[in-house]
Amino acid sequence: MKKIIFALFIIVLVFQPVSGFSQSFAKIYNSPTDFFNGICDSSQGISVERRTRGQIIMNGGNDFKISSEDKVLSKKLKKQVWGVVCNDSLFINGRPLKLGGSWYGYTEIIGKRLFLLAGIPLDKDFQDQMAIASMMGGPLVAGIAGADLALVRYYYEVYLPYGSISILKKEKMAELLATAPDLAQSYALEEEPEKIPVLKRYLLELKKR
């Protein structure tokens, strides 16, 4: 009975209405170096779709699916493209960076710095650095831990022009806020300084400066 209820719950999640859908002109970047140098391809009819919680639990991956009516371009967008700018928003593909699996994460641009919101790293050395194994509690239990991990998000700083990455920790955030003493003082008082909503709030405040 419990298995049936769980299965029905998953079906409901997967078939939630999709939000955040758009279809428009986009700039397509094949590498971080191309983005840094302003070299891009352009295309009409690019779709940006916010994936549902159920889709992420069932299939993993990041928060945004980007595709095209052109099947060849859609395949390239999924597996090869580094980033897409659509409606002045930058989305970076997690697949080439081995972050969160497939699909794209929304990226804040602050000056010349990029902050990507994406899933857990798939690179084992990176996982070890972030102590992700401890979050799993050993082997995954009946897929539940795996589902929880599929929803975990981190902010990563993506360094241009070559695209190396590092996780945004409280020490790095404090360093970023050094140019805004009022924000730095407020951030120092946060009880959970590495929670995503907290980091996002300060990134957005810094972006306004």
Mark where each language-model region is.
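Bacterial Sec-dependent N-terminal signal peptides
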Residues: 1-26
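C-terminal partner/receptor-binding element of secreted or periplasmic proteins
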Residues: 174-209
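Aromatic-patch recognition
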Residues: 24-183
